[in-house]
Curated annotation (Swiss-Prot):
One of its GO terms (cellular component) is cytoplasm. Its main location: cytoplasm. It holds the Pfam family SPOUT_MTase. One of its GO terms (molecular function) is rRNA (pseudouridine-N3-)-methyltransferase activity. Its EC number is 2.1.1.177. It is an enzyme of class 2 (transferase). InterPro entries: Alpha/beta_knot_MTases, RlmH-like, tRNA_m1G_MTases_N. It catalyses: pseudouridine(1915) in 23S rRNA + S-adenosyl-L-methionine = N(3)-methylpseudouridine(1915) in 23S rRNA + S-adenosyl-L-homocysteine + H(+). NCBIfam families: PRK00103.1-3, tRNA_RlmH_YbeA. This is Ribosomal RNA large subunit methyltransferase H. Homodimer.
Length: 159
């Protein structure tokens, strides 16, 4: 299985990079993991609704350019479906069973994802109603993907 995580913005925090790298290394025995970062759109602190839409659209275009047409897309969105770790594992296993060998998780920038990205997504998943920094979300996501594979294989880790 090929799993791609497309996220907006460059990861700068060393402690997050170390955590992500550790889980990517652990995942190596289960799946091929690609981390793709697209540039975030520079914007002032105070934006009108129209300006926010423009920023999200530009970031969305960059995201969509990185996703092939044969990829199953899971957009991380606050209004998406919340799952337990077991449900996430079962869903990933089901995708593999039905021949979906390319899966992309998409993490938006600080303003979220543009409607075009949400429309392209095959599903939307939420990790809760709290707002998290998108770079921290990447670490949480990689850990949950690793946990999913451990659950699928019946290996100890998940408690």
């Amino acid at each position: 299985m090929n799993i791609t995580i497309v996220s907006v913005g460059k990861l700068k925090e060393k402690y997050l990079k170390m955590g992500i790298d550790e889980y990517v290394k652990r995942l190596g025995g289960y799946a091929k993991i690609d981390l793709i970062e697209v540039a975030d759109e520079k914007a002032p602190e105070q934006l009108s609704d129209a300006e926010m839409e423009i920023v999200k659209k530009k970031e969305g275009e960059r995201i969509l350019a990185k996703i092939s047409t044969d990829t199953y897309v899971i957009a991380l969105a606050i209004n998406g479906k919340m799952k337990t770790s077991e449900q996430m594992a079962a869903d990933l296993e089901s995708l593999m069973t039905y021949g979906k060998s390319k899966i992309a998780f998409v993490i938006g920038g600080s303003l979220g994802l543009h409607e075009d990205v949400l429309k392209r997504a095959d599903e939307q998943q939420s990790f809760g109603k709290m707002t998290l920094p998108h770079q921290l979300m990447k670490l949480v996501l990689v850990e949950q993907v690793y946990r999913s594979f451990r659950i699928m294989k019946g290996e100890p880790y998940h408690k």
